Amino acid sequence: MNFTCRNLSAVIFLFCAVSPAQTNVGWPAYNGGPEANHYSRLDQINRANVHQLKLAWSYDTGEKGGLQSNPLIIGHTLYAYTPSQKVVALDAATGKLKWKFDSGIPGTQPVRGVAYWTDGKQQFIFAGIMNFLYCLDARNGKSIPSFGEGGRIDLRKGLRGDYQHQSIALTTPGIIYKDLIIVGGRNPESHPAPPGDIRAFDVHTGNLRWSFHTIPHPGEPGYESWPPEAWKTAGAANNWAGMALDAPRGIVYVPTGSAVMDFYGADRLGNDLYADTLLALDANTGKRLWHFQGVHHDIWDRDFPAQPALFTVQRDCKHIPALAQITKQSYVYLFNRLTGEPLSPIREFPYPASTVPGEVASLTQPKPDRPEPFARQHLTEDMLTTRTPEAHAWAVKAFRELRSDGQFLPFAVDKQTVVFPGFDGGGEWGGPAIDPT
């Protein structure tokens, strides 16, 4: 999902004026807002006139590499990343550069966005750059020196052991709640990897306010789902896909990924809570309110790949605060987001045991009854290429030498296995879009 590009472009609808009621509608958070539903109430651009869009301006970053940034629009300013993890503020109407922040650290992977905080007087931009979280003045791009150490905190600190030999990167922005920024991080996918603790930092000082262990410590719920020493050695179970927030109720929703190693779990036997889990946490304290594990003992890298989207559903003449979580398997899980009660039944289905020495795959995995998966669930012979008779014959021969029995088929040492949908999904980090109207 990386794209080689240099330009950050904007298209503006040119043939009509913007009404005063719409001039202050922005894009204040990653994927549109804390609800992560990709929704904007702007309606001048629609299916009837979208073909009339023309390029209004283009900003040349002067760089090459993957550009995945979901820009924020705050007032008349656009905030985004360049491919090398520099932060830019542009005039949203003209594309003119207002300021650029260069940390001096060469960024090696795309970052998907920044986070914005204001109390009506101060305005901060929070930017993840490699192992660090920076706090910038949104008006001029200068570091806020009172935050952490000289305007930044080292995200490796406080996780486990010698932090200088660890790696964690905030490639998806944290989420703002009151005077907190709540973050996860992208961890290595092999040993050694730090645990994927969910942490909340004070936006003014950078001090840690709370932490939730996704690999539970002794005495914490879920500890029994790992080997006894896993909290000292196991890694990841991290939130790399972003979070959603019910701000009025003070609940943050955190989907996590698999534990390391992604495709081998003989050193972490058990269901491995809270890997591959949707967590509902009290945003004030980090206390777990409810959870749902989408994959038990993941050995397929079936992370929850995107933020959940928050919305309201009507059932039996009642309005239910709801949540939709997509998966790499193309499932859509629907929950009452206050209680964790499924809005459609979720059943456990049996799957084969692993034949890999030392590995113990879970014999059941969950699946929602509704809605139906949004991508194909099986690869069969009749789907293979028919471009030429020779190509078809080759594909059929190769396919018959593979194991292809559907979802959650454990890998084997003596035969290759088809993974379908592929490792990237299915659903991916863009997440679902919901029109709340």
Regions found by a protein language model. Name each.
Residues 1-5:
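N-terminal secretory signal peptides that target proteins for export/translocation
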Residues 75, 178, 205, 247-248, ...:
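Short acidic-glycine loop/turn motifs at beta-strand connectors
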Residues 48-62, 87-107, 120, 133-165, ...:
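Extracytoplasmic/lumenal domain signature
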Residues 401-437:
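Glycine-rich, aromatic-lined ligand/substrate-binding cores of catalytic
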Residues 27-31, 66-84, 108-133, 166-190, ...:
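Repeat-blade elements of multi-bladed beta-propeller folds
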Residues 21-44, 359-396, 404:
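N-terminal pre-domain segments of enzymes
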Residues 22-64, 70-73, 96:
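Mature N-terminal segment immediately following signal peptide/propeptide cleavage
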Residues 7-19:
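Bacterial N-terminal signal peptides
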